[in-house]
Design a protein with these regions (language model features):
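Helix-to-loop junctions at the C-terminal end of transmembrane segments
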Residues: 69-82, 167
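Structural signature of the two symmetry-related core transmembrane helices
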Residues: 85-100, 180
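Intracellular juxtamembrane helix-capping segments at the cytosolic ends
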Residues: 123-136
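Residue-level signature of mid-helix packing/kink "hotspots" within the transmembrane helices
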Residues: 64-72, 156-157
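A membrane-interface helix-boundary motif in multi-pass transporters
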Residues: 165-183
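Short amphipathic helix-loop junctions that connect adjacent transmembrane helices
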Residues: 35-54
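Paired small-residue
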Residues: 97, 108-116
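Juxtamembrane intracellular "pre-TM" segments in multi-pass secondary transporters
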Residues: 1-20
């Protein structure tokens, strides 16, 4: 009941609603690859065995490793140039980099693209969180952060389900670049709507 009440309140605040949508979509993009990466790495290596499984784990972690390095940089850029503006650049860059995965021909190229993808995507969460803090009143800030966390968790389970479903009907390579297309769409939506708050 409380969740429904909170959602009704969120629908009246464009800033909270925008942030929930962005958290959801970004998490979907991150998790879309999860059910497919081992098989895809195996295809690139020409075999699906223990080595491919281990390599898939390493590659999936690369975005997180690069994120550790890049997140402070993007946070500073957001504080200096504006969180929404920086978020547009981040999602556009991540989307374009992700599209390059279509052209990878071996596992090492795929790993490099994943690492660069993480360098961009690392700045998304800090900047939309900072923007959320700016556009919400202190009285509802805790509630707002709770809602966007729920949206992020929703993306966390929708992403793998969607990736697995798409993997049944599309080549893995095309499923992967779907994330890039979504991120470019997020960037364009953010740029043209310039959502900041109420």
């Amino acid at each position: 009941v409380e969740l429904i009440s909170d959602l009704k309140e969120a629908l009246q605040n464009r800033g909270i609603l925008f942030t929930m949508m962005m958290f959801f979509l970004i998490q979907v993009c991150v998790m879309l690859l999860q059910p497919l990466i081992t098989m895809y790495v195996g295809q690139l290596m020409g075999k699906v065995d223990d080595e491919a499984v281990q390599m898939a784990g390493v590659i999936f972690s690369l975005a997180g490793i690069s994120g550790i390095l890049a997140a402070p940089f993007w946070g500073n850029r957001g504080q200096r140039y504006g969180y929404v503006r920086t978020f547009c650049y981040i999602t556009l860059g991540a989307g374009v980099v992700n599209l390059f995965q279509f052209f990878t021909t071996d596992v090492y190229q795929f790993a490099i693209v994943q690492f660069i993808f993480g360098l961009f995507l690392a700045g998304a969460i800090p900047n939309i969180n900072a923007n959320l803090a700016e556009v919400t009143d202190k009285s509802i800030r805790g509630k707002a952060f709770g809602l966007v966390t729920s949206a992020q968790m929703s993306g966390g389970f929708v992403g793998p389900l969607l990736g697995g479903a798409l993997g049944h009907v599309l080549p893995t390579r095309l499923v992967i670049i779907c994330a890039g297309i979504i991120l470019i769409g997020v960037s364009a939506f953010t740029y043209f709507t310039k959502v900041k708050g109420k």
